[in-house]
């Protein structure tokens, strides 16, 4: 490799650490005959970096199956947690932007955080904070001072699908006020978990009235409505644990 090529590669790697927008801006200024070459090289470097991060995160957090999108415009990876090694864990779909996702906020039925981010997942499918840096939560991809370990697994976007959830109750079903089959199986599971006592006939009846949750294989039955999707979106890791006991436990 010539000295000039080495300098270009070194600059490209430095830009990669600074964020994707800067890197693409740098590549766009290259001569046309070099642009495609370095664009391809950059995407490969980015893919390898993100894949390594995701693998380490999955290993550290015990995530057994997941799918994820790569939101390049932010400059760091967001992983969508879709399941864990715990048989009692809830299938809860949350984008996280930092590997500080520990037991305090991990979605399980015994250590379940009922206030945040569940409430945000319940009422909103967009960004929690569009001005996340001004909120002094996360600056430049790093968690701001004052947030202890386990406090910030920043849920920027969280939802099971785009259908709006409601406070459904068994009485509403009996009266015919709602159609349980309007929602997908995953949404209906969440609604039943939120609005029925654990290990009760009411919960089992509510679950039976809805659409059964589909097995996630090959491709999920939802789509993420985002203008920032990439060809690597919806990569599915097909080794999910059993989830027969999704609705057991206490909230």
Curated annotation (Swiss-Prot):
This protein's UniProt keywords: Host cytoplasm, Virion
GO biological process: viral life cycle
Range of residues in the leader sequence: none
Keyword Membrane appears in the UniProt entry: no
A single Gene Ontology CC term: virion component
Compartment(s) of residence: Host cytoplasm; Virion
Function: Determines virus infectivity.
Protein name as annotated: Virion infectivity factor
Gene: vif
